[in-house]
């Protein structure tokens, strides 16, 4: 005999009885049996607060009463109730309605019921407490013959002394009462039933005597035989095969629902569907219903296959795993229904009797029970198909696309799944916008980070948007703000070295805890979620701009660029040119940067630039460009402004190269103005001196006319560059900077400013022809300066010699001598004649110079009139306000005339 386990419940219960009564094991046998009966029973009904099970009970009641239409209507109303979310305790209301539906006029005779129960003695040697089947997660994978198992269980009662307890769901389907007296039981099942009645006391107390139970008669057994016993084929059939029953198909379908082949219903790989075995005979109606029901198994397999494959794929990411978890959760609810259906069949199998036609599970009733699950599985299968090959935000977008449906039941299901799928995305998002941390191992978030990028390019290149991963329930503006928030936090920490906690930097100091409800991503995009994003965006951006302006003087550096690199500080630029002129006229190869730097510092100290911030002045420097053969200092000189740290994010290398190009252009234009000023000074100073040389009047008149044309041209160009280009663009930039909400707005406004002045200063690729003509004009001005300087040198030298000759002549005459000898007079006349003979050469040189200059200006005007920029076309009017060049150039007459007619028609 086996030694009993000292820790088993049976031994412990017997020891407890002995300890309480103070007697031996033999003396407490009666009390021990009573204790077993008490534990095996449940005197208080156990009501589990499960809305699903209460709903299924109500549906079963409709089916039992043959009110399938009312059952379908109840399912639809219940779905609407779930989608509205008005009631919080739906279970309580449903349970109340179920209780009220019982007929109060037919109270069960509890006394007779209890008498019938207690008339059945408990087994004498019961050594185990009853086990109640509590909603398994899935059905058994093996297919067993329930009738054989039931017979074995009944036979084991007498041999082992342990009662075989039927397996019921605590709140599962209510089986028909089998406590109708001994006359209703078949002789071969009576002993087994008597052994089981005591352990089901709790169920009987909870369920009571239903009206259907009181009316149950001995008609149950014939029904059982008719449903379970196979029927032979009709006489007209040629084969002698046996036609399978509806009950067998129901049993098979419960396994097919889980993707397991049954005895008669199996997967057909060629057609990819479940079919009834062709070797067995089934009526057409049953085969059609079986085909409809077996679709659940195919849908189940499709979903299960997807979850099994993706659950093992770690690269699928958190969003994908959440999607799989949502599918698992739906399958779990599906398995719960199968458990209820399975327990309904087990009632009949374990007891060995049928519950009657009204409570039996038929294929048609199975259709009603699986109507809602089939809709859910179809929706899930469609989601699985649509989400193939997607991950992260793209997967969330695919799920979100299915929420745009008019079916409230389907929309509620997909929204629930979307809430689970969007949960990791919301975690990523909150971690990013409140802490600046990006923990995206599997690249699921729509913000991407490049670890190779260094700190100096953090703002521009390190973080970017993965457009394919932006969820469809988020707008591009929201995504851009999310990117800017986290980028600003990282910029503050890594570039500005500002370690201010996020809670202090932002008014909304939300921690990075997991959000309670991810559904706000798609249900309240314009209110709560938008408010959070906007609050974090405005606070973070404002704090970043405050740090840049107060700690790093961003606006002052921007103004310094305008004053020095764009020649806005007029007194400084003029004085610098005066100081640099002796150095810059030399060949470029003879210049030394330290000499030019010293001159720059002198110009700063002598002008209003000395009052600027020392932080700005120390960044101002001299830069020499690459030297080409024949270059002078004017061609290679440039001012430079050193930028580093956070301000280098705004003034990037590309921006500084643009500033350098603009400075060289403005510097050359300013030099032309400087040259023409010197030419005008030469005219004013030498006009009286050369009055005594009438032969030069024609040449000087030519010089004055050409100089006036050049001065007019340069003045109009300077006006255009200074006011229409620089000042207007700068004013627009400054207004944008003051109104900027984030650093990107400042960078964008600054880039637009540079692009505008590059374009309007003719430095872009589209204006290359105009720039070449303008440089040719500048070259002609320099040539004119050289020609006039040569003319004045020759004229002044000749004037000096004439004055010296006259002075010597007067001295000799005062001494009483001849003023001049014949030889000296011949030499003087010869020299004067040679000078006079050189004047036509000078005049022709000036005429050629004038011709070239006017030709270049005319070509420049033609290009201006055909330009697409309206400001450049207006510039052509000012350059030729008196139509001087228009009279000389036919193309100008055509272009301007056409333009005039166009403006007239407009």
Swiss-Prot record:
It is found in: Cytoplasm, Cytoskeleton, Microtubule organizing center, Centrosome. PANTHER family: GAMMA TUBULIN COMPLEX PROTEIN (PTHR19302), GAMMA-TUBULIN COMPLEX COMPONENT 3 (PTHR19302:SF14). Its main location: cytoplasm. Residues 208-229 have a biased composition (Polar residues). It holds the Pfam family GCP_N_terminal. Residues 208-242 are annotated as: Disordered. One of its GO terms (cellular component) is spindle pole. GO terms for molecular function: gamma-tubulin binding; microtubule minus-end binding. Interacts with gamma-tubulin. The keyword Cytoplasm applies. One of its GO terms (biological process) is cytoplasmic microtubule organization. Belongs to the TUBGCP family. It comes from Xenopus laevis. InterPro entries: GCP, GCP_C, GCP_C_sf, GCP_N. The keyword Cytoplasm applies. This is Gamma-tubulin complex component 3 homolog. Necessary for the recruitment of gamma-tubulin to the centrosome and for the formation of a functional centrosome. Keywords: Cytoplasm, Cytoskeleton, Microtubule.
